[in-house]
Amino acid sequence: MKQNQAMDFLELKHQKPEYANWVSMWIPLSGSLVTLLFAGAAALCAKSSALAAGLLTVAAIVAFAFTFYMLRARTALSYAGGGVQGKVLEDVLKTLDQAGFNGHGKLLDIGCGSGAMSIKAAKKYPRALITAMDYWGAGWDYSQRLCEHNAQVEKVASRITFRKGDAAKLDFMADTFDAAVSNFVFHEVRSQKDKHALVLEALRVLKPGGCFAFQDIFFAKSHYGDINAFVEALRPYVSEIHFVDTPRNSCPPRSFWGRWA
């Protein structure tokens, strides 16, 4: 028994967490395939139609540029590359500190992906219990099993519970959590087009005075309309709310934080 436990410990010690990239590998792979298809079609049309060959060549160049850009973005975001993902998540937790979270109690991570934010929170707040939920839908490189693996490797599995769910209808009673965080999730929730209602659902599960820090593409009017009006519409429901406006090309992107009433 002890020998088996020792072997398990050694295996974990040599394992590394696998934090999936926000840019799915399917995107550059698909781009590469499209590039090859356009290039091949251009070669076939070269003798029969110079115009068609030219247009297909332009399309191949555009597809290649897109693929190259997405590969660069994937490298910059990855923990093994530029590490941008980790920096963004750290900023969310710093914002939660700014909101007044003292590191005690229950914290909810909405849309946990591969568990990176949840694990960072567990390490930063050793006295907190973390609940992390995600839909883990098709098209993403995430899964509950991956999250649990990462938490075990990072030695925080005893304080994190991962569960499948829908951010539009959280499976928790009101006044359950002392804090809530979310990063790049709300705009992806297709089950609720009304993002005001979606944010209110996230706030519903907070205890009175609970802290929150939400980060997303809040500059996207297609999702949030006028963000200042959006925040003002939330103000009656919270005791404190602040919108952090940053340039679109900066990192981290825009976020807001505060306390539930």
What do these predicted ranges mean?
Residues 103-113, 131:
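Conserved class I S-adenosyl-L-methionine
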Residues 168-180:
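A short acidic, Gly/Pro-enriched loop at the edge of an enzyme's catalytic core
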Residues 209-216:
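Conserved beta-strand signature within the Rossmann-like core of class I S-adenosyl-L-methionine
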Residues 195-208:
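A short glycine-rich, Lys/Arg-flanked "PGG" loop and its adjoining helix->strand segment in the class I
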Residues 239, 247-261:
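Core SAM-dependent methyltransferase catalytic element
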Residues 114-126:
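Conserved SAM-binding loop of SAM-dependent methyltransferases across substrates and taxa
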Residues 125, 189-190, 206-208:
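Helix-to-beta-strand junctions that scaffold the AdoMet/dcAdoMet cofactor pocket
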Residues 20-27, 67-91:
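Class I SAM-dependent methyltransferase Rossmann-like catalytic core
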